[in-house]
From Swiss-Prot:
KO phenotype (gene knockout): FimA-deficient cells lack major fimbriae, resulting in strongly decreased adherence to host cells. Double mutants lacking both FimA and Mfa1 lack major and minor fimbriae; they fail to adhere to host cells.
Site residues by UniProt (Cleavage): R46, A47
Gene coding for it: fimA
One of the Pfam families matching this protein, by short name: P_gingi_FimA
Upper taxonomic lineage: Bacteria, Pseudomonadati, Bacteroidota, Bacteroidia, Bacteroidales
Name assigned to this protein: Major fimbrium subunit FimA type-1
Location in the cell: Fimbrium; Cell outer membrane
Summary of the function given for this chain in its UniProt record: Structural subunit of the major fimbriae. These long, filamentous pili are attached to the cell surface; they mediate biofilm formation, adhesion onto host cells and onto other bacteria that are part of the oral microbiome. They play an important role in the invasion of periodontal tissues. Fimbriae and their constituents are major virulence factors. FimA proteins from different strains have highly divergent sequences, and this has been used for classification. The sequence-based classification correlates with pathogenicity.
Length: 383
């Protein structure tokens, strides 16, 4: 009889352990407080896909942490607010994320959430599901109802009246104008026929939280099938077709480019891997494709490859005498989250056969950039 009693007690203990484990996986708090959060996103701009997709919040998730442990988590679809999240009074950490897709967040510790990463994808290039985050925020919850982003005139504890700001993890780089104005030395001799726009040396992975989102992952992506082995070319480099676009003449309301992740190439010494936006096509002489001695001479000058094709690369947000920036902006030699880099390119002569080598100060290009947040950076480039 005693053995049977101990056996049943053991089964009950195991059952309780299983229940506790389930509760840790899906935090449910029968606390004495609730919090409701209203979100503010950056304004949308003209996207490569549907314009509003840049700012669309398909899924908003709010997590409340008591120390390292997740006390509550709640999500809302196609919404910019999450209401009545059940938790307990006291000092807590609030974490807000949007467009996390299939990412599993339930039960994660605060440290695990802060360590999350994302990768650049084909879906990003149509502005769909651009992930957004706000830095973890320390708050003090009072018993009863708590609010962030609501008018302070109603009931409850209004922690902040302003909506919580959330920012895209991605940046956008795009040509908004490309024009050919050959200088006197090349005018009426050479012409350029654009065929493709490429994104080169794009970081594959990014952190989701932190003062900088650049991490130590050494993988990069390119839209070109050509192996350049230039001074900027990274060792871990993979081709993806979605960093390549057939050429369409860009305009302010029809930008041509790509969404990318943070990349820092501001080091004063050593090897750097700057993110590049590049237009590619044929260099022609007297209206005809280069051939024979003309092709050989252009190759010897490092203007074209064996097929007579040339590249006009623009190092995004880079400090160069060939580049000018709008509004007295100082280039930072890095890609920053939630920025859009709008580039006007003027071509004044032949390009290069290796877009992943440093450009010379006498390159045949002018670049004008505009930077904004969805910080616009306006960059003007002249080749």
């Amino acid at each position: 009889m005693k053995k049977t009693k101990f056996f049943l007690l053991g089964l009950a203990a195991l059952a309780m352990t299983a229940c506790n484990k389930d509760n840790e996986a899906e935090p449910v708090t029968e606390g004495n407080a609730t919090i409701s959060v209203v979100l503010k996103t950056s304004n949308s701009n003209r996207a490569f896909g549907v314009g509003d997709d840049e700012s669309k919040v398909a899924k908003l998730t709010v997590m409340v942490y008591n120390g390292e442990q997740q006390e509550a988590i709640k999500s809302a679809e196609n919404a910019t607010k999450v209401e009545d999240i059940k938790c307990s009074a006291g000092q807590r950490t609030l974490v807000v994320m949007a467009n996390t897709g299939a990412m599993e967040l339930v039960g994660k510790t605060l440290a695990e959430v802060k360590a999350l990463t994302t990768e650049l994808t084909a879906e990003n290039q149509e502005a769909a599901g651009l992930i957004m985050t706000a830095e973890p925020k320390t708050i003090v919850l009072k018993a009863g109802k708590n609010y962030i982003g609501y008018s302070g005139t109603g009931e409850g504890n209004h922690i902040e009246n302003d909506p919580l700001k959330i920012k895209r993890v991605h940046a956008r780089m795009a040509f908004t104008e490309i024009k050919v104005q050959m200088s006197a030395a090349y005018d009426n001799i050479y012409t350029f026929v654009p065929e493709k726009i490429y994104g080169l040396i794009a970081k594959k992975q990014s952190n989701l939280f932190g003062a900088t989102l650049v991490n130590a992952d050494a993988n990069y992506l390119t839209g070109s099938l050509t192996t350049f082995n230039g001074a900027y070319t990274p060792a871990n480099y993979a081709n993806v077709p979605w960093l390549s676009r057939n050429y369409v003449a860009p305009a302010a309301d029809a930008p041509q480019g790509f969404y990318v992740l943070e990349n820092d190439y501001s080091a004063n010494g050593g090897t750097i891997h700057p993110t590049i936006l590049c237009v590619y096509g044929k260099l022609q002489k007297n209206g005809a494709d280069l051939a024979g001695a003309d092709l050989a001479a252009a190759q010897a000058a490092n203007w074209v490859d064996a097929e007579g094709k040339t590249y006009y690369p623009v190092l995004v947000n880079f400090n160069s005498n060939n580049y000018t920036y709008d509004s007295n902006y100082t280039p930072k030699n890095k890609i920053e989250r939630n920025h859009k880099y709008d580039i006007k390119l003027t071509i004044t002569g032949p390009g290069t056969n290796n877009p992943e080598n440093p450009i010379t100060e006498s390159a045949h290009l002018n670049v004008q950039c505009t930077v904004a947040e969805w910080v616009l950076v306006g960059q003007n480039a002249t080749w």
